[in-house]
Design a protein with these regions (language model features):
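OB-fold and OB-like single-stranded nucleic-acid-recognition modules
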Residues: 1-134
């Protein structure tokens, strides 16, 4: 089963309607500066991109994400958002690609590079891997 089956879609018809795929598989590098657990069970991670990847940011990343790219490993935490529970996207699935000890470390992250149409910023979502480098 594809990771897309576990992406929350909310008011959109499908996850692919909410997240416009720009590149289905992209690996980037940068430093994790912040992470928080979201109501839909995902991590919301802010990545300070290495200079060669800064062109991946758009105006919403600059204004709403302090100039960081968002990474969203899915179904990694307790889900308490009602529509996510009703969709059942995390039922029987847990993604363990991120731990908080990676905050402050340089990593390579791989996933689908998308435009989040709900928020307007770009992100990696779903994320397939986050590994420390150097």
């Amino acid at each position: 089963m594809s990771l897309w089956a576990h992406v929350y879609h909310g008011r959109f018809l499908s996850a692919e309607d909410r997240l416009q795929v720009i590149n289905p598989c992209l690996t980037i590098t940068g430093t994790i500066v912040h992470a928080r657990s979201e109501a839909d069970g995902d991590w919301h991670i802010q990545l300070d991109l290495d200079s060669e990847y800064r062109s991946l940011l758009n105006q919403a990343n600059l204004e709403k994400q302090q100039g960081y790219l968002v990474l969203e490993p899915m179904c990694s935490n307790r889900v308490w958002q009602r529509d996510t529970i009703e969709e059942g996207v995390c039922d029987g699935f847990s993604q363990n690609t991120f731990t908080t000890d990676l905050i402050g470390h340089r990593v390579a992250a791989t996933g689908a590079y998308v435009l989040d149409k709900q928020h307007g910023w770009t992100e990696l979502h779903p994320v397939t891997s986050i590994v420390p480098i150097e």
